[in-house]
Curated annotation (Swiss-Prot):
The protein's name: Transcription factor PIL1
InterPro entries: bHLH_dom (IPR011598), HLH_DNA-bd_sf (IPR036638), PIF1-like_bHLH (IPR047265), PIF3-like (IPR044273)
Compartment(s): Nucleus
Chain intervals with Low complexity compositional bias: 8-22
bHLH domain residues: 229-278
GO molecular function, one term: DNA binding
Length: 416
């Protein structure tokens, strides 16, 4: 074959534009050359002339050539195939439709006839069974009637009917009262069975609901009962505590003289003031009698501080005095007098207001009364006690010597 040289667009004047309507076909004698111009691929055909030279012609693009060459042949083939297929199908379609319709109708008719025959056979068999069972029931007795209480088959036409028809057919064959009674008993038994089932179901549902309620209550009652019990126990404990506290407050009110206050705070204030006055009185009386005691704790439960020899009416009871009282006596003055309020010292000027039947008392004056031995000390030990002279003063008291009695307590006597 001859080589296919590429020619430029400027050297070929006989060019056919792509938009031209000329669409010549290729033949075996022709030669084709592909040329690319402006982004399009063009085909160039060379035909031999009479003198042996080739005539150059331009054609359209390859797509146009493909469409022109193969579209016409494809259309012809489609027409041929369509003609060959459509003609026999158009002739055979109505015949096939008729045949299929006839076959469907025949099948439907056969199915209907078979269904009708089947239903008839089933109904006949059911009637025969019912009649035979009823005859057997009348002969044997009502005990075997429970076997025939089953409803008819699901495939029969009598499924939708009630049990009345089931027993009505049997009444035709009955010739005596025994058969009628058996039918009635069957109806009653069937109804009783239904009622029992319904009641059983209802009872089950009620039981389930009751169980659920009891479970819910059992779960919710436990914390409630615990809370109630705890609150009740707490209330009882509080009541007991209040009763004991009230009893103690009443006892304290009875101990305080001329105290008619019911308020707890005021009652405690009065008790505090009364105890302070008693402490000061004990200290003053001990200094007046010349008994200078060291800073120790002395037992004061068995005797009153008022009965120390000043002929003062003892108004305080032994129970009103505490068991131990601190007696920090100093030589320069009375203990606690500097910090004492003026209300506590009012008994010096008016002691009869606090304790009745008590004369005015001055601690530093001469004591002419004899010393009274406390009740807790025996008479054998009382001989060891001595009495201060009438001219006892503060200097003599400071120079006094300590004397220990046989009872273990420390007392003082004059150097004479």
């Amino acid at each position: 074959m001859e080589a296919k040289p590429l020619a430029s667009s400027s050297s070929e004047p006989n060019m056919i534009s792509p938009s031209s309507n000329i669409k010549p076909k290729l033949k075996d004698e022709d030669y084709m050359e592909l040329v690319c111009e402006n982004g399009q691929i063009l085909a160039k055909i060379r035909r031999p002339k009479n003198n042996g030279s080739f005539q150059k012609q331009r054609r359209q693009s390859l797509l146009d050539l493909y469409e022109t060459e193969y579209s016409e042949g494809f259309k012809k083939n489609i027409k041929i195939l369509g003609d060959t297929q459509v003609v026999p199908v158009s002739q055979s379609k109505p015949q096939q439709d008729k045949e299929t319709n006839e076959q469907m109708n025949n099948n439907k008719k056969k199915l209907k006839s078979s269904k009708i025959e089947f239903e008839r056979n089933v109904s006949k068999s059911n009637k025969c069974v019912e009649s035979s069972t009823l005859i057997d029931v009348s002969a044997k007795g009502p005990k075997n009637v429970e076997v025939t209480t089953a409803p008819p088959d699901e495939q029969s036409a009598a499924v939708g009917r009630s049990t009345e028809l089931y027993f009505a057919s049997s009444s035709k064959f009955s010739r005596g009262t025994s058969r009628d009674l058996s039918c009635c008993s069957l109806k009653r038994k069937y109804g009783d069975i239904e009622e029992e089932e319904s009641t059983y179901l209802s009872n089950n549902s009620d039981d389930e609901s009751d169980d659920a309620k009891t479970q819910v209550h059992a779960r919710t009652r436990k914390p409630v009962t615990k809370r109630k019990r705890s609150t009740e126990v707490h209330k009882l404990y509080e009541r007991k505590r209040r009763d004991e506290f009230n009893k103690k407050m009443r006892a304290l009110q009875d101990l305080l003289p001329n105290c008619y206050k019911d308020d707890k705070a005021s009652l405690l204030d009065e008790a505090i003031k009364y105890m302070r006055t008693l402490q000061l009185q004990v200290q003053m009386m001990s200094m007046g009698n010349g008994l200078i005691r060291p800073p120790t704790m002395l037992p004061m439960g068995h005797y009153s501080p008022m009965g120390l020899g000043m002929h003062m009416g003892a108004a305080a009871t032994p129970t009103s005095i505490p068991q131990f009282l601190p007696m920090n006596v100093q030589a320069t003055g009375f203990p606690g007098m500097n910090n004492a309020p003026p209300q506590m010292l009012s008994f010096l000027n008016h002691p009869s207001g606090l304790i009745p039947n008590t004369p005015i008392f001055s601690p530093l004056e001469n004591c002419s009364q004899p010393f009274v031995v406390p009740s807790c000390v025996s008479q054998t030990q009382a001989t060891s006690f001595t009495q201060f002279p009438k001219s006892a003063s503060a200097s003599n008291l400071e120079d006094a010597m300590q004397y220990r009695g046989s009872n273990g307590f420390s007392y003082y006597r004059s150097p004479n």
